[in-house]
């Protein structure tokens, strides 16, 4: 039984991959035309489809929307009962129907023409009513479904999904849509945390900043280390410019070497040291700490003045891993 199940699963995947392998050679003028129509659309892309095509259509609409192209899904039946009012003359409709002969099209196509709405087709029958009415046709046809009865949409839905991805990615690249643009539409996700957060969003402020003056003693710095528990202290002049850092490691080395606690900290500190810019991306700042094998750093503003402090744990708690 186990072998039979494995064989059935493998056969399905092989058939779907075989059908999908024909898609690249089908991309041509119609694909370019469809992409350009979407690129120049001043409104939204309205995706529609029935049955399994509708389910895939929802995903295509979501992919377009998250990659820089405003889009939403409308079910054809709902469109014919009022939701056509959502679609405006500035919009584009992408209709998905493998047969290209869905009866709802008989009523939808004239309404689109009345509003001068461009129609794009994703179909397995380019010469169907849908294909003939569309300004661009994306061919998703298959020789056979992966279903052993040749009934359940399987290979055809894979082709539909892949064609939708190809269209969305081509448009995305043409728009110059980048990682930060993507993060703005995913602010609650891990990518949003990685790309949208700046150092100043995560840093410790005010009394939580470990700092001493240049005139402070090693003892003062040691007490500040203990108070804040960050593993370092920023050593600043009277203008709050960071002149160095005094770390747990500096303290250990100082004491092992017989240094006195009354010595000015500027004689025991690491001169300069690593500082992070408050306006830098948090992910970039974390990489600096990792690369330099340190766990914390002072944060400075554009003038080099101390404005905060941060350690690796602050990044991890914000989901920047």
Curated annotation (Swiss-Prot):
Transmembrane spans: none
Residues annotated as binding ATP: 49-54
Source domain of life: Bacteria
Enzyme Commission no: 5.3.1.13
Pfam families linked to this entry: CBS, SIS
UniProt domain CBS: residue ranges: 203-261, 269-321
Chemical reaction(s) catalysed: D-arabinose 5-phosphate = D-ribulose 5-phosphate
GO MF annotation terms: arabinose-5-phosphate isomerase activity; ATP binding; metal ion binding
Site (Catalytically relevant): 52, 104, 145, 186
Residue positions binding Zn(2+): 75
Presence of keyword Zinc: yes
Domain SIS: 34-177
Binding residues for substrate: 68-69, 75, 81, 107-116, 141-143, 215, 267
InterPro entries, per the entry: CBS_dom, CBS_dom_sf, GutQ/KpsF_isomerases, KdsD/KpsF-type, SIS_dom, SIS_dom_sf, SIS_Kpsf
Protein task: Catalyzes the reversible aldol-ketol isomerization between D-ribulose 5-phosphate (Ru5P) and D-arabinose 5-phosphate (A5P). It is also able of sustaining the biosynthetic pathway of 3-deoxy-D-manno-octulosonate (KDO), a unique 8-carbon sugar component of lipopolysaccharides (LPSs).
Protein family per UniProt: Belongs to the SIS family. GutQ/KpsF subfamily.
Subunit structure: Homotetramer.
Protein's name in the database: Arabinose 5-phosphate isomerase GutQ
Phylogenetic placement of the source organism: Bacteria, Pseudomonadati, Pseudomonadota, Gammaproteobacteria, Enterobacterales
């Amino acid at each position: 039984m186990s072998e039979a199940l494995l064989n059935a699963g493998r056969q399905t995947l092989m058939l779907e991959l075989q059908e999908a392998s024909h898609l690249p050679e089908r991309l041509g003028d119609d694909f370019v035309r469809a992409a350009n129509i979407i690129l120049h659309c001043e409104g939204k892309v309205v995706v529609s489809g029935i049955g399994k095509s509708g389910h895939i259509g929802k995903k295509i609409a979501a992919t377009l929307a998250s990659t820089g192209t405003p889009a939403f899904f409308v079910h054809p039946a709902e469109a014919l009962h009022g939701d056509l009012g959502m679609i405006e003359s500035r919009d584009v409709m992408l209709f998905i129907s493998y047969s290209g002969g869905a009866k709802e099209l008989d009523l939808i196509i004239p309404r689109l023409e009345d509003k001068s709405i461009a129609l794009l087709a994703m179909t397995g029958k380019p010469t169907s009513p849908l294909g003939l009415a569309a300004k661009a046709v994306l061919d998703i046809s298959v020789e056979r479904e992966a279903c052993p009865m040749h009934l359940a949409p399987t290979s055809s839905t894979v082709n539909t999904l892949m064609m939708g991805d190809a269209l969305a990615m081509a448009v995305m690249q043409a728009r110059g849509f980048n990682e930060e643009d993507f993060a703005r539409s995913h602010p609650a996700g891990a990518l949003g945390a990685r790309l949208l957060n700046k150092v100043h969003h995560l840093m410790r402020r005010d009394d939580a900043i470990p700092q001493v003056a240049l005139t402070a003693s090693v003892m003062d710095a040691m007490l500040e280390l203990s108070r804040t528990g960050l593993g370092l202290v920023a050593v600043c002049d009277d203008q709050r410019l960071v002149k160095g850092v005094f770390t747990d490691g500096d303290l250990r080395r100082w004491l092992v070497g017989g240094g006195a606690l009354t010595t000015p900290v500027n004689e025991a500190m690491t001169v300069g040291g690593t500082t992070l810019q408050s306006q830098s991306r948090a992910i970039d700042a974390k990489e600096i700490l990792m690369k330099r094998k340190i766990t914390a750093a002072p944060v400075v503003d554009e003038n080099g003045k101390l404005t905060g402090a941060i350690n690796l744990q602050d990044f991890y708690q914000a989901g920047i891993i």
